[in-house]
Structures are given as C-alpha cells and as structure tokens.
Amino acid sequence: MATRTQARGAVVELLYAFESGNEEIKKIASSMLEEKKIKNNQLAFALSLFNGVLEKINEIDALIEPHLKDWDFKRLGSMEKAILRLGAYEIGFTPTQNPIIINECIELGKLYAEPNTPKFLNAILDSLSKKLAQKPLN
C-alpha cells in the first residue's frame, strides 16, 4: 500500500506533466496513479490534491509569487513549480500541519529536482506558511 509521501510524489509527477503541456493528464490521472500502486484512501488523497491544485492554480501562483524575492515565477523549472504548487495548495487549503507539508516538499525536491532546490523550496514555503498564519485564506 502506498504512503502519503508516495501519493504526493505521484501528484508532483502529474503536475509536472500538466505544466509541461500535457492537458490530457487530467483525464488519465486516476489510472496513472493506480499504475503507481496508489490505491484506495491514498488514491482519493492524491486525486484531491491534484484536482485541488488545478482548480486553484491561479490563486496558488499568486500566493507563491510574492515569496520568490529575486525570482520570476515564469522562469522557474516545471518540477519546482509542481512542488511549490502542491505545497502552497496544502498549506493554504488543507488541514495538514505546515511543518509536515514543508518537509514532504523538501523531500520531493531532493528526489526530483536540482541539488539546491530543497533549500529554495523550504525558504518559499516557510515564508508562505508564516504569511498565511497571520492572515488565513478562509
């Protein structure tokens, strides 16, 4: 049985495919997750994250951008965008504790991105979580 960490990793892969121009990924997300042995509760969890990010993608991007400092969101790599979007969605729109979300995103960065990406993800998501703690979205 898959873990939430594995489910998040699969969601990042789906978001990466979407960011890379594969809009058909929305139609086959469920079967792709099942191929990765993401089933039952974890399948529902992964699909809720994937669909949640896509439904709120513009709002999520607007949440992330002010925390980039010297970076332009459009110039970020597709994998970095995928991980940041997942993290920002979970921080802003789910009850999962922020330290858990940030740690999971750091681990995903180590697995999928460039060596300096985990520090970058940590800085952005930590800044975002502190901002939302002061002024929640709901």
Swiss-Prot record:
GO terms for biological process: DNA-templated transcription termination; transcription antitermination. The keyword Transcription regulation applies. Pfam families: NusB. Gene3D superfamilies: NusB-like. One of its GO terms (molecular function) is RNA binding. Belongs to the NusB family. PANTHER family: ANTITERMINATION NUSB DOMAIN-CONTAINING PROTEIN (PTHR11078:SF3), N UTILIZATION SUBSTANCE PROTEIN B-RELATED (PTHR11078). This is Transcription antitermination protein NusB. It comes from Helicobacter pylori (strain Shi470). The gene is nusB.
